[in-house]
């Protein structure tokens, strides 16, 4: 599996950090360093808002799914540019069928807001429009798929 992915760059999302802190990292595997970091929303489950992420792989759960993802094709959807996500683990195997995608949302700020949280998603890793442009530059330039790893 690993041989099929970009060996220089990985996207890491650390859901153990508060949503108001940068927790989505563009990581340089060759230099063992963070290239760029930003905020990312988490799923709130069946509530209107949750300070902490809710995790599930079930359809209609509104929860974030932990695990590794292959970033798939881009498309233009409800929130503009988005990338399909293909779950590679038992904890996120339903992501594609759940329509869990990587997309931006204008209410996700560019700067950290901690101790204040940011908005929630319905399970998608949702970033600011400017950070999605940074991700797009990496994804579109890569000859191999980029791996996204969401962990807690």
What feature does the model see in each segment?
Residues 1-122, 129-140, 146, 152:
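Cell wall/extracellular polymer interaction/catalysis modules
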């Amino acid at each position: 599996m690993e041989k099929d992915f970009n060996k220089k760059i990985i996207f890491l999302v650390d859901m153990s950090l508060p949503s108001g802190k940068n927790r989505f990292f563009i990581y340089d595997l060759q230099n063992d360093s963070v290239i760029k970091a930003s905020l990312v929303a988490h799923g709130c489950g069946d509530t209107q808002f949750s300070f902490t992420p809710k995790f599930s792989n079930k359809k209609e759960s509104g929860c974030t799914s932990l695990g590794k993802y292959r970033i798939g094709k881009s498309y233009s959807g409800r929130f503009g540019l988005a990338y399909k996500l293909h779950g590679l683990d038992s904890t996120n195997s339903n992501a594609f069928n759940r329509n869990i995608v990587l997309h931006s949302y204008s209410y996700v700020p560019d700067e950290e807001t901690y101790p204040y949280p940011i908005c929630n998603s319905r399970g998608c890793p949702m970033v600011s429009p400017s950070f999605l442009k940074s991700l797009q530059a990496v994804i579109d330039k890569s000859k191999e798929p980029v791996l996204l790893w969401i962990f807690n």
